[in-house]
Amino acid sequence: MQTWQLPEHIADVLPTNARQLESAREQLLALFRVHGYELVQPPLMEYAHSLLTHIDAGLSLKTILVTDRLSGRQLGIRADITPQVARIDAHLLSANQGINRLCYAGPVLHAQSDGLLNMREPLQAGAEMYGFADIRGDIELIDLMLKSMKIADMGKVLLSLGHIGIFRALSDAAHLDAGQSATLLALMQDKDTETVEAQVKAWKLDGMWAKAFSLLPRLYGGREVLSDARGRLPDLSAVGGALGELQAVCDAFPDCEIHIDLSELRVDNYHTGLLYAAYAADFHDAVARGGRYDGLGGYFGRARPATGFSFDLRSFIGRLPAIERQPAVLVDAEDAEAAHEAVEALREQGQCVVIDYGIGHNVSEELAGRLKKTDGVWQVVKR
């Protein structure tokens, strides 16, 4: 193996793209800030039992584990920042009994990629709200998610909605055990209605519940899905409440193209209610995903309502505006010492100044000029 080779699905970010990413990150955090979201920076590595909440089984498969040479305990390299933010809200910010609005933008590392086209080191950015159970909180986060997409040239963005509360209400009413619910959840993702029908028939469920589960994979499409669902699903208060929340989101974004899928349930995840995602043209998967995950902080001692979204900022590469390198002022190597004060003054003003050693350099080909002493004063002389 060549010493310069990197592991599969791991890549360097070179200067052109690095400038784009850093600019996008700054814009994103500024957007979050003016909406009241405070930046947190959790550590890249924690004790494994803190990272693996046992709520999201899939997270354990993504998390790289190592042994801490200091304590002998098992450490994990984070694969998702949300459990860390839940820990911060539950423990470090527990003095605030009201709403905590938090945001982040940092790298995570996956033991295996989510797909052939996905990287194992995403730059995960997101925003989360803790302490507010009302649907207005979800609407605020969805609005912020859609605004985040405008940092890049995404074109028309599709908002996709689901609600795991409908499936769970039906599961409880039909008295499914945990194993049956997990099996049915997995089948729902494939939208294989025949297999779903065969499974509920094998379990000999009551006809009303068997019909409802068989119907869920067919309830997808535009806003009209909600009225269809109201007329065909069992009249359960939890189902009606979930449909009401979906309707509230649709009403909040009248000009947005919306797709509703009542069998979009995200197997092996920590979400508990409304699910939302943003899709854009030419992306093989959702650009951003979010949803409600009430109670996640309970693993850390304080269960609270929570909703939020995240995305891989590196996936924006190719859609971000070009950030040209700042033209540099050159100073001859033999003049560097004498011109030191003038050089530092220019740098404090934000001007890039590079010492020219006469052997070529990787500065912008478009130079701002050269620092020369004219009439006893160091001045930038244009070429």
Swiss-Prot record:
Pathway: Amino-acid biosynthesis; L-histidine biosynthesis; L-histidine from 5-phospho-alpha-D-ribose 1-diphosphate: step 1/9. GO terms for cellular component: cytoplasm. One of its GO terms (molecular function) is histidine-tRNA ligase activity. Keywords: Amino-acid biosynthesis, Cytoplasm, Histidine biosynthesis. Gene3D superfamilies: Bira Bifunctional Protein, Domain 2. This function is generally fulfilled by the C-terminal part of HisG, which is missing in some bacteria such as this one. Heteromultimer composed of HisG and HisZ subunits. This is ATP phosphoribosyltransferase regulatory subunit. The lineage of its organism: Bacteria, Pseudomonadati, Pseudomonadota, Betaproteobacteria, Neisseriales. The gene is hisZ.
